[in-house]
Amino acid sequence: MVSFKRLSVTWDEHSLFIRGERIMFYSAEFHPWRLPVPGLWLDVFQKIKALGYNGVSFYVNWALLEGSPGHFSAEGVFAYEPFFDAASKAGIYLFARPGPYINAEVSGGGYPRWLQRNTGTLRTNESAYMDATDNYIAHIGKLIAAASVTNGGPVVLLQAENEYVPLVNNEASIIGLFTPGKPGGPDIYGHDGYPFGFDCADPESNWTPGRLPIDWGQLHLEISPSTPYSIPEFQGGAIDSWGGSGLEGCAVLANHEFERIFYKNNFGFGVKLFNIYMVSATY
């Protein structure tokens, strides 16, 4: 039996427990560095809460915090304490995703430019690369730990690395490469889902047979039965790339009908950690 007095966040095969209370973690993705106005963060969190979410997932952008090797600075609009405080005031739990690689559709995936001169192979255990991440990980890890629910803060989950297979997804489908017990496996297994892709030029073409998953719940039970069903990223919109067709088509692609059908479909599979990437106009 796990002692909830000792651990603030635990889980079983059904859901997370936060301070002993069973919850469904339903979160929206929001990145403070994309809206670098700390005075607006509480308003954003309150609106997210009003939409029915109880959590927010966020990336940390290493490139903005360590512009030169060994010089870490998370101050001013890049300070995270106001972000954590605003989440606490709004009653929002946080899911921290500090990378060091984040992708996030940013230049270099959030890597600082000076890392290109590193002699080690990036995203491996080569010492030159690992040593280059030490200063960032030590500082951001300390900030996140201080804001953990165990220390009275809002952070309840942390994702190590991001989109490791290979560059643009956390398992794009339920394969089971990273499940508890396997080398490098996390505590809780999860996969991503972008069933409609990003063809904003022809959004209606996505409504075809085969787009709606029918077996995700069963697949989860087969490959990670001891953890709650988790989707750390599920489609909440689409990307309009440079020279694309325009955001109007993207709004049609992932509209209210998509949300009603696909989100409820995931609820039917028993998802208990469900993160929408991204929310509203915060991207």
Residue ranges, per PLM feature:
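Conserved, mostly hydrophobic/aromatic
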Residues: 20, 48, 56, 87, ...
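An active-site-proximal structural segment forming one wall of the substrate-binding cleft
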Residues: 76-98, 117-157
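Aromatic-lined carbohydrate-recognition surfaces of secreted/lumenal glycan-active proteins
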Residues: 97-100, 149-165, 172, 179-180, ...
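N-terminal carbohydrate-binding accessory modules
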Residues: 1-55
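Catalytic-core region of carbohydrate-active enzymes that cleave or remodel glycosidic bonds
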Residues: 85-88, 92, 178-180, 201-283
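Aromatic-lined substrate-binding rim segments of carbohydrate-active enzymes
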Residues: 40-109, 178-181
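Short, well-ordered coil/turn segments that N-cap beta-strands
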Residues: 24, 52-54, 88-94, 149-156, ...
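Gly/Pro-rich turn-and-neighbor structural signature
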Residues: 152-223
